[in-house]
Regions:
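Conserved catalytic cores of phosphodiester-cleaving nucleases, focusing on short active-site segments
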Residues: 15, 30-37, 41-58
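Generic recognition of cysteine residues
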Residues: 17, 82-84, 136
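Short, conserved, surface-exposed binding loops centered on an aromatic residue
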Residues: 22, 41-42, 74-78
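Acidic-basic catalytic patches of nuclease active cores, encompassing PD-(D/E)XK
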Residues: 1-23
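Catalytic cores of nucleic-acid endonucleases
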Residues: 55-123
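Short, well-ordered loop/turn elements at secondary-structure boundaries
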Residues: 26, 45-46, 79-81
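Basic, glycine-/proline-tolerant helical and adjacent loop/strand elements
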Residues: 23-28, 64
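Non-catalytic C-terminal interaction segments of nucleic acid-processing enzymes
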Residues: 119-200
Length: 200
């Protein structure tokens, strides 16, 4: 959760991004505005993106998925110069695609409702294909603090640190903290821009 919170809050320091307080501005996690226009992959140009952010691609059940889709459809009805993104920190792959879901047994989608991996979102809002990779390279100190604090706490059924340490045994890096950081990146971001050439 700390890493997810970090990923959401850091956007307040990126030009054009607003991170509303909980429940404000329609409950969106991030609102990105660019008066010069934002070009989507299909060449559509809009000026605002409303973002629902999820830490991992498989964290929404069908009810939450349907609710999110309806929220996005309602936003498009109220603002025809926007797009709505489901941004996933750990997506199945690097992507910026139309998001289609089944609601009430009907498959629905809209070209302005998109499922986007975080690397593609950073690229879109910064103009730098490697922006997410660069930010992640600044994270070692934060990750070390999280790991140090995690090991001091007793949390039932939490096997993430144990699994990461097991992954590091397969890496040929002697420094455990660096190996854990690399394992985290491999686990979640192996096919994102910048990571694929450095971790593959």
């Amino acid at each position: 959760n700390a890493i997810g919170y970090f990923h959401q809050r850091i956007f307040q320091y990126i030009a054009g991004c607003k991170v509303p307080e909980n429940g404000n501005d329609g409950g969106w996690d991030i609102i990105y505005t660019n008066k010069n226009g934002i070009k989507l992959p299909d060449e559509t140009v809009i000026h605002k993106i409303y973002v629902e952010m999820k830490n991992k691609h498989n964290t929404m059940n069908s009810a939450a998925t349907g609710k999110t889709m309806i929220k996005m459809q309602n936003q498009l009805i109220n603002d025809d110069d926007c797009a709505c993104f489901l941004v996933e920190v750990i997506a199945q792959k690097s992507q910026n695609i139309n998001w289609g879901v089944t609601v009430d047994k009907k498959k629905i989608s809209h070209k302005l409702i998109r499922r986007v991996s975080i690397d593609k979102f950073y690229s879109l809002i910064t103009g730098d294909d490697y922006a997410f990779y660069k930010i992640c390279n600044m994270l070692p100190k934060i990750i070390k603090e999280i790991i140090d604090n995690q090991e001091k706490q007793i949390i039932p059924n939490d096997t993430v640190i144990k699994e990461l340490k097991e992954m590091t045994r397969n890496l040929k890096i002697n420094i455990e903290d660096l190996a854990i950081q690399t394992a985290i990146f491999m686990l979640g971001f192996g096919n994102y821009k910048g990571f694929e050439k450095n971790l593959g």
